[in-house]
Structures are given as structure tokens and as C-alpha cells.
Amino acid sequence: MQPPFRLFGAELSPYSVKVRSYLRYKGIAHEWIQRSAARQEEFSRYAKLPLIPVLVGADDQAMQDSTPIIEALEAAFPEPALQPQDSGLAFLSALLEDYADEWLNKAMFHYRWTYPADQESAARRIVAMMFDGGEPPAGLEDSVRSRMAGRLHH
């Protein structure tokens, strides 16, 4: 994969923001593309699964899943290094990344979808991003809210 890159993602996706932060840290040229109904056809050309982020290179090669994306980019763009040189610190860094990736999102989802005011706010923002300011179908916010809140296991 070669730059410039196109990154399909969403502001509310911790995995999308993780890859965008990495690209900014490295100074790697990229275009942020908000995944939305208007961009669905383009997104579908590259996505193997309906999940974000999707990173597309100038060669039209695409990757999904934030950790493998960053690992591939780190191999291609090693400076500045993401991981410390010291093996002990590198281990701790990898451990923290894995913990944050796999477990801290549970706290994020809890606070986004447990309390009614947060549910309403998150559903409203998700629907607004999906339709880029266009008119969404009636009841979509309620549908998103009930679907996502129903996924929590308390």
C-alpha cells in the first residue's frame, strides 16, 4: 500500500480515530472519508466486511481492522517508531494497546449506551453522520438507540 491513503471511518468509532491518530502522528498523507450513505458504494468496493476503518492506498489496495492496518503501516513507515526500542517497554506498550483495543471499548460503550441522555446523544450523532445532513428515515434514531443499548450485557 502506498500513500496518499483514504481512510473510511467515523468520528464515533474508536478504531477509526485510532488509525487516523496514527497517520497524523506519522505525518502520512491521507484523506479522511466519513462513512455515510452517500459514500456507501465507494466504501463497499473496498470493505470485505461492513466494518470501519478501511484504509485504501493509492494502488487501490485496502485493509480493514485497526491493529493490522497500523502494523502494516509501521513496517512501511518505521520512523518515527511507534514502539519503544527497549524490549520491556515495547512489551508494555503492546500490552496497553491490546488492553485498550479489546477492553476499554467496553467502558466507552457502557457510557455511550447505558444512560438515556447519552443514548439519545449518540444515536442522534450516528444518524446525522450516516446521512451527511440529509433527511434520515423517521424513527431511525430510536432504532439505532434500541439496537445498540440492547447489546449491553449488565
Residue ranges and their predicted role:
Residues 138-154:
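A conserved mid-domain beta-alpha-beta active-site/ligand-binding segment of alpha/beta enzyme cores
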Residues 1-139:
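GST-like domain detector, emphasizing the conserved glutathione-binding G-site
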